[in-house]
Amino acid sequence: RSTLFPYTTLFRSTLMPCCPAVIDLWCEKPVTFPVISETRNNLSTAFLIRDNLVKLISDQGLSVEQALLDGLYILLELYKNQPITNAHIQEYFSGHTLNKLNTAMEDIHIPDEDTFIECNELLQDLSVNYRKEGLYTAFLQPVLTEACKYSNIYSQSDDNSMSRTLQTSQKQFCSMLTDYDIVFRNYLANELFSDLISPEAASTKKIIEHMIIKMQWIMIEYTAIRQSLFLWYSHNANSPLTYETIREHIVIISRMTGYDDDDIREYLENSFAKLIWDWGYAALIMGIRK
């Protein structure tokens, strides 16, 4: 299934990840997107930023989490340092700048359990209304049961053995997740291409603000998918992850997070201290491992 988004002079068609057949298209080779020529200066800038972000998520030399964190950091810097030019954008996305950024990230340590607890809470919060309405029950029930189990364990125990057990289980899970790396990269590249640009945003500052908000939402989507998959894996006695399981989680979480722009903005304003996060919060939910 595809959806059309109008611009003043063009239409763009994108595939929707809430359809299983679309995910099937993404499991073999990198997805490609049309090159769009735009003469209006503010949208030309937006297209350049978006193209670089898509290129970043497609770079297999970076983990998915690292690419998302790099992308958000650059967007936040561009937002703070107005006005910007195409030369500024190219400099931020240059190999030299990215190497410095990723080297700096190596000195950051966020405990795995802190990331796990926050991701658990994010997934539970996203699921509240669907549970009330009795939607996606067969999918959510085992996942959220497992989430509650871990929440209770962490609230009642300071035992380091729990942390070690979680780390071992997560290491095994992450190893299996890498088998489907191309699916996640294609999913995220499509989200970036289809969602980052708003034709309604009049100024460059507003365009970049919109990009930051949508990037945060994409990070929430990815976090929810990854967390739900880990909880499924834990609930099913560490059973191997299959492609069908990966696809189901991407499809259902995509349906659950398919909010329009106003609803996304409202959700972020109601759920977080600030509409635009500090970069450190993104690092918390993505996880930074040495």
Predicted feature residues:
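Hydrophobic, aromatic-lined core segments that form the binding pocket/scaffold
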Residues: 62-290
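Charged, amphipathic alpha-helical linkers/stalks
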Residues: 12-100
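Single conserved hydrophobic/aromatic residue that forms the stacking wall/gate
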Residues: 1-9
